[in-house]
Amino acid sequence: MHIGNAAAQEDVRIAPAPETDILLELGVGPLIRPSFEGSSQYEIVPSPIIRLHYLNIPGLIEIGQGLDTGLSIGPSFGYTGERKATDVPGLYGLEDLDATYELGLRLGYGWSFAPEYGAEVYGEARYAFGEATGLVGGLGANGIFRPTQSLTLKFGPTATFASNGYIDTYFSVSPQESIASGGALDIYDPSGGFKTVGLSAEARLEFQPSWFLNGQAGYDRLIGSAADSPIMQAGSRDQLYFGIGISKVFSLDLF
């Protein structure tokens, strides 16, 4: 689970004026999420909102049309906080972990079948650095419903993946850690691959021109090597998250 993500995505109510070069949305809000991947304990963290709706560099590139249609591209980032074994019953013997940061790109493609209905698919890949290093990312698809001009609803399946280095950091148990746990945690050497599958839902309301109320909720189920880790004895394979935030779209004329 990530503290937040930035993505290029368009909204039916947002359309660039002829002189606009960039439509950038910025905001923030609280996110309730597991305190670490696989945890049954939850925490509240700040979740930034950064969306690139439109970018036009004359003579070079134009991305986004202000609708949920066509190709979108933008930044994607994530953050995993510290994990202290002494804070979690059942993890005694494991080494403490520092924070991991993730930075990468998100690609998406959207279709609009009617003013009220649409769909989108997306993928994102990020490089993780800090405590863990490696490649992480996700895939997903959404059905889109617009009951009014100011309200957009999205719902669909998701999946995430991670490379060996990342999975090893958060789900392995070394021989030394197994001994330190008194044998409560077996030695475990996981491998990279798909990490979770789940469902996500989003609601987005424009309550004033260029001002938005954003809500999100999701469920992830740990799978593969992550789900088989002895660390799951101290947590849960089922992961939930809920978030809400306020954002504003800024229009910039740079070129």
Model features per residue range: what roles?
Residues 48-79:
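Glycine/small-residue-rich interface belts in oligomeric ring/scaffold proteins
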Residues 17, 29-31, 51-53, 64, ...:
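Transmembrane beta-barrel domains of outer membrane proteins
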Residues 5-58, 251:
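Short glycine/proline- and aromatic-enriched beta-strand/turn motifs that initiate or cap beta-hairpins
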Residues 18-24, 42-46, 67-73, 101, ...:
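Outer-envelope beta-barrel architecture signal
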Residues 24-32, 75-79, 121-127, 139-141, ...:
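Transmembrane beta-barrel strands of outer-membrane/channel proteins
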Residues 26-34, 58-66, 88-92, 118-129:
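Transmembrane beta-strand segments that form the barrel wall of outer-membrane beta-barrel proteins
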Residues 36-42, 97-100, 126-137, 193:
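Solvent-exposed loop/turn segments connecting transmembrane beta-strands
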Residues 12, 109-113, 132-138, 142-237, ...:
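Outer-membrane beta-barrel transmembrane domain signature
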